[in-house]
Amino acid sequence: MVFIVLAVITRWSLAWMSPVPGNGRWLSMLYRKLIFLIIIAFSASLSTRSAIAESIERILFNGRIFTANSEQPFAQAMAIKDGYIFAVGSDEEILAYKTANTELLDLQNKWVLPGLIDAHSHAIIGALAELSPNLQDEVVDLATLKQRIEGWFKQSGHGSGQPFVVFGANPALWSDPQILADIFNKNRWKTQPLLLMGSDLHTAWANGAMLNIAGIDDAYVQNLSDHQRHIIGVTSKGSPDGVLIDAGVDLVTVHLPKPDDEMLLKAGQYAVHMNNSYGITGWMDPAANAGPGEALFSRKPASLGTGISPAYKLLAEKGQLTAHVAALLVASPLSDVADLERLDTVRQQFAAVPNLTMPGIKIFADGVLEFPAQSAALLGHYKNSGKQGEMLLTAEGLKNLVDAADEKGMLVHIHALGDRAVKQSLDAFEVARKKRNSGIAHSITHLQLVDPNDYPRFAALNIMPVMQLHWAEMDNYLLDLVKPFINETDFWGQYPARSLQKNGAVIAGASDWPISTANPWEAMHHAMTRDGPDGGLNKAERLDLNTMLLAYTIHAAKAAGIDDKAGSLAKGKQADFIIVDRDIFKVSHDSFKNTKVLQTYFAGNLVYSLN
């Protein structure tokens, strides 16, 4: 083909290079040089195109591709070169790059999407919990609870006196802690430490032997300041009843053994495989410097703990980290600028780990809304106590910490469930935005209650809502542990996703796994229907499919600070994509939530296959 084109150009040039009367020899020479340059340039272009085609290792064609790229939302085909996307377009355009060495993947009209991103997932902590005795948030009767825990303990081979931990306990168990005490403070449990970790990861129940290890007794409770008294539940006589909230949980978990490298690697492998099976090729881990044996809610400012971060390094060293991980470091409520410098030393330890970034910090502004914890900070009051919940740091302290982090170029991700915590978080971001326009995609996560006056502030301040919309359903949590204790307006206004979107906010999708399932298809279903086992929750706040697909692709990637390489299918981005088993744009909502990922690719390589 190249030779035919050159022959045509040569014949054309000979006609033009004939002497022209009146113009002399110089014009003939000019034509010769011009045609020579055209031939050279054309030959180089064809050679370059040929070389590029030779290196296109895979072409996907005959498909339907949702790109999450606003400039080219849909396509038929995609070419992959060296693990990156070389081109996206029609079958005709992309198949032009085919050579004898190119692998062709006929999509047979199936849908392809970017690899999904989860903007808030405790992936390693969740895996450690899954690999341990786990109640899976199930509400069970006391006989079943006792039977399961006794069975797990016998299977564990735990030595006497070694703390035994059961994960995934439904917080409804804490409603009457004396019932737990009657079972697990007698017989073997009188000397055997037991910790039931709440499925919300904010609450727990410890038996007497476990409280003894932590030094929590009557005297300890009596010496707590008024600000701290809410972290430990007490009986009518003022003795600890075993219920622990936020920093109270830390008092016990710091006495748990830290997982060794073998366990961290096993948990990491579990987490990566599970996420890849759901089509997830990236996530933001919001507490990478915390884990068993380390404090989370009451971290000391000088802490240099690395938490579960080594798990990601171990995976990467084995070539098994087939996901982008943006790992955040939890900052102490007492943190200042100096503490951010110390956190930087932790970041530097993992600076060269492939597929791992540490873009910033996570701040806990408050706790959770559910009874009996009720530690989420409200503008109003809880009906039963008349209290407003707790801010974990002062308004001024939050402003200073956010401002200092923004100045250092750190992404800031704030946990805020109550409307007072959300408002004060926005106030803090407003200070930083007024001082400088860093452009960093800061975010607030959870957002169970938001003052309607604050809806427009997210867009105005360029703050992303990172929402776990699997929670936007009517279930026992809302009916039994929330509804009786807050006013009707607040109850029906929970998780105001559509209101935030209508006011210009860009929503990112997240799971908060293991607090709820990591399955993004179920979460998107809940966001689109707001249906739950016990009815619907304010269906005016439903979101559409396109919004949710963007929330779990390019918007989540932006929230995690990885949108330069992931989150959409566009030229130059890493080739992270999935193939699904059904037409997600046409099936019913019930069918959508059962979507299965047939294949997941990371950097152009197949990392998961259903079959």
Tell me the role of every PLM-derived stretch.
Residues 403-413, 420-442, 452, 456, ...:
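His/Asp/Glu-enriched, well-ordered alpha-helical/loop segment
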Residues 54-61, 66, 70-344, 359, ...:
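Divalent metal-binding segments
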Residues 49-52:
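Sec/Tat signal peptide C-region and signal peptidase I cleavage site
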Residues 20, 24-36:
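Bacterial N-terminal signal peptides that target proteins for export
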Residues 347-352, 459:
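Acidic (Asp/Glu)-rich catalytic clusters
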Residues 37-45:
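Bacterial N-terminal signal peptides
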Residues 356-369, 463-473:
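Non-cysteine beta-strand/loop elements that form the S-adenosyl-L-methionine
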